[in-house]
């Protein structure tokens, strides 16, 4: 599995061999909508992305993400 930055997902998808999956480094804790700069789970699915890294220590430390935030992301990812 490769988890490129959001801007490079489609480029990496075009380069990987069939048995390598591409995922996202992050996804929004909000549904698709007017959340500037956020990448919604729904939008990732539109690009064939079925995996996202949720709960990474950097997101928790630098952005203050909590268990509740992570739970919301999981809920949206599974929807």
Name these PLM-found stretches.
Residues 1-79:
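Active-site loop-to-helix "anion-binding N-cap" substructures in soluble metabolic enzymes
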